[in-house]
A protein has these predicted regions:
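Phosphate-ester processing/binding pockets and catalytic centers
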Residues: 1-158
């Protein structure tokens, strides 16, 4: 029996009531889950910290896709980034280098036997569920997929 870790996160926003402006900025709500063997996780984490150092990032830095987009927008519009913006500290890297960091981060998964589960809600087509119910549906779907993977070899997921 092997032990696996599952990490889950979301991207995008969801609202029961959606204006045209909201739909333009948030056409999708996406939840992802990464399933990885615990032994592989240790190596992946070490390699990820080395990669962060290579790019001049702190160990605790988290790069969000919205940061990349916001940096791109501010630079394109030639506007100064306000000091209170979370992505201000990445201004010196710029969006292109952040995209390279993201690509290099994903490449770390290539030699590892990992599974990625994505659940996607099209906000333009989705019925008006409450945010809590939509989250439950996404998590239930992810959990079902993880359980199916674990049953193959009688493995354990945390």
């Amino acid at each position: 029996m092997s032990i696996f870790f599952a990490f889950s996160d979301e991207c995008g926003q969801y609202r029961t009531e959606r204006s045209e402006g909201f739909l333009k900025g948030s056409p999708f709500y996406v939840r992802s889950a990464l399933l990885i063997n615990a032994e592989n996780w240790k190596k992946l984490n070490e390699d990820f910290l080395i990669l962060k150092e290579k790019y001049g990032l702190r160990k605790t830095d988290e790069i969000k896709w919205s940061y990349v987009w916001s940096l791109h927008k501010y630079l394109k519009d030639r506007k100064p980034i306000p000091e209170d913006k979370e992505f201000k500290r990445f201004e010196s890297l710029g969006p292109e280098k952040l995209i390279n960091f993201i690509a290099d981060s994903l490449k770390l998964l290539l030699p590892i036997n990992a599974k990625i589960v994505l659940t996607i809600t099209d906000n333009r087509l989705c019925p008006r569920y409450t945010e809590v119910n939509l989250l439950k549906m996404h998590l239930q779907n992810v959990m079902q997929r993880l359980e199916m993977e674990m049953q193959l070899n009688d493995d354990l997921c945390v």
